[in-house]
Regions:
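Soluble FAD-dependent oxygen oxidases
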Residues: 2, 11, 15-513
Length: 513
């Protein structure tokens, strides 16, 4: 149940006693701020003098408001009354303390790509992190400090220009921490593991407004939880993570478009390609989709697949020979510096996958292998929608992600909160529906559930696993955070210790109020 702002306070202060001459704390005053009367003017008057002069405070009447509150999906949007953009890391605990004293809910935002239904229960102040965007490479050249507002694009470009790379999400527009606190899959995981596997330490603002340094020797229990379930425990203002020499000057990409008649051949070749944990570590990422392309056919979806290889075309094409043997209706390939690979694979800031402001209906499941029979059922279901509702079909994208997973599986499962290291493939059903079109929203939900069940039925005997960063919020706790009872108990224990009032409950929460 959604609690009212008057009954939910994240302030965990000392007992109040009546002392002669003492002022009454704001949260006991008769006219405390509530959701109904929260304005940027009042927040500026009360908070402005306590934070740095580069901190921005504004509300819905400001021309910047719509831009900074826009999200990847308009499904289950949080209700934002006031924006506060801290100018310094030290402003964040001050903002949190202010919110606590006034019973105001707060939500930290970097990329705005969360799609969890739980976000729709939020009503309060957005702490926009975009001004916290500095990167500092350490003298050793083995790590760097990153501030909490960074998205993937500037991290890739800055490090590359300095001769380095690190693990990031696959899409340029996603927040580094939004991805990393849930694990963080990306093109370097075959070599180096997940984003979270490379985090060395974090500066975290807890729910009570205190700041802690979290690493292997300080709050090591919380470090475990931050690596896979970190959205539940605090606001990360900065973090140190591993960086690596950038390697080859160019990467090779090869994109294919196949017709549906090639489906079984494609997926059988993919299973051989990935083998049993034998995907070459430099064959960093391959991703495919069922989607409409009416320049090829208006009667059924096409199969699009993209491969990215860390190295030369000559090396890559040896591995891609089985796919070159499958008759395609379109192919393109090239060799580009790594920062241009997202554009080549359709995951850049300017590509549709990064566009904000649509209504998305989604579902997801982790897989170990591709099941060609299940994929045929999914493809034929898509084809039926093309005939039944071309508008719904036009906005659909059934996505498949394959990685080199050696670096992920090399990390012990019990060493972090990230639960699904033996799963190798990520999937996402994603349908864009028109705003305020209830009938199509319901049809898209039904389709999303159908595809999820078909994917999962293709791996008999396995429980359903869902990547928390792709989870829509309707999965079970076990499906998002792991099926082992000890793992969930450890997360609950950390929650009780570090966030007893469950302030951080708006992104696929461990504890549901």
């Amino acid at each position: 149940m959604k609690a009212s702002v008057l009954s939910v306070s994240c302030y965990f202060g000392a007992l109040w006693t009546l002392v002669a001459g003492a002022s009454i704390p704001r949260y006991f005053q008769k006219h405390a701020i509530t959701r109904r009367d929260l304005t940027s003017t009042q927040v500026q008057q009360e908070l402005g003098g306590l934070v740095s002069n580069t901190t921005l405070i504004f509300g819905p009447d400001d021309p910047r408001f719509n831009n900074v509150t826009s999200r990847w999906t308009d499904f289950s949007r949080p209700h934002i009354q006031v924006i506060i953009e801290p100018g310094l890391e030290s402003d964040v605990p001050t903002i949190v303390q202010y919110c606590n004293e006034n019973s105001i809910e707060f939500l930290a935002v970097s990329g705005g790509h969360g799609l969890a239904a739980s976000l729709g229960t939020f009503n309060g102040i957005q702490i926009g992190m975009r001004q916290l965007n500095n990167i500092s490479i350490q003298p050793s050249g083995k790590s760097a400090w990153f501030q909490g507002g960074l998205t993937v694009l500037p991290v890739i470009q800055y490090l590359w220009d300095k001769g380095f790379v690190t693990t990031t999400g696959g899409c340029e527009c996603v927040g580094m921490l939004g991805a990393g606190l849930g694990g963080g899959h990306g093109r370097f995981e075959g070599l180096y593991g997940l984003i979270s596997d490379n985090i060395l330490q974090l500066n975290v603002v807890l729910a009570n407004g205190s700041t802690v340094r979290v690493n292997a020797t300080s709050h090591s229990d919380l470090l475990w939880g931050m690596k896979g379930a970190g959205h539940n425990f605090g606001i990360v203002t900065s973090y140190e993570m591993n960086i690596f020499p950038r390697g080859p000057d160019t990467w090779h990409y090869h994109n294919y478009v196949w017709r549906g008649q090639q489906l079984e051949t494609v997926f059988n070749a993919l299973n051989v390609f990935h083998g049993n944990d034998t995907t070459p570590v430099n064959m960093a990422f391959n991703a495919g989709s069922f989607l409409m392309n009416t320049t090829i056919t208006s009667e059924e979806p096409i199969i699009f697949w993209s491969f990215a290889y860390r190295g030369t075309a000559e090396e890559a094409e040896k591995y891609l020979a089985p796919f070159n043997a499958i008759e395609a209706v379109y192919e393109e390939m090239g060799d580009v510096p790594y920062p241009q690979i997202p554009k080549a694979q359709g995951t850049s800031m300017s590509d549709p996958i990064c566009q904000h402001g649509n209504v998305h209906r989604t579902s997801t499941v982790f897989l170990r292998v591709w099941n060609a029979t299940a994929e045929r059922l999914i493809f034929e279901g898509f084809k039926q929608r093309v005939a039944q509702d071309p508008v719904l079909a036009a906005g659909a994208n059934i996505m498949h992600e394959g990685y080199s997973t050696e670096g992920v599986e090399a990390v012990a499962s019990a060493s972090s909160a990230y639960p699904f290291r033996s799963d190798r493939h990520l999937t996402l059903f994603n349908a864009i529906v028109p705003h305020n079109d209830t009938a199509r929203e319901q049809a898209a939900w039904a389709w999303a559930a159908e595809v999820r069940d078909q994917w999962n039925a293709g791996q008999p005997g396995r429980l359903l696993d869902a990547y928390v960063n792709y989870a829509n919020g309707f999965e079970t706790l076990e499906q998002r955070y792991g099926h082992e009872s000890w793992r969930l108990e450890r997360l609950r224990s950390l929650k009780a210790q570090y966030d007893p009032d469950n302030c951080f409950r708006y992104y696929n929460p461990i504890i549901v109020n």
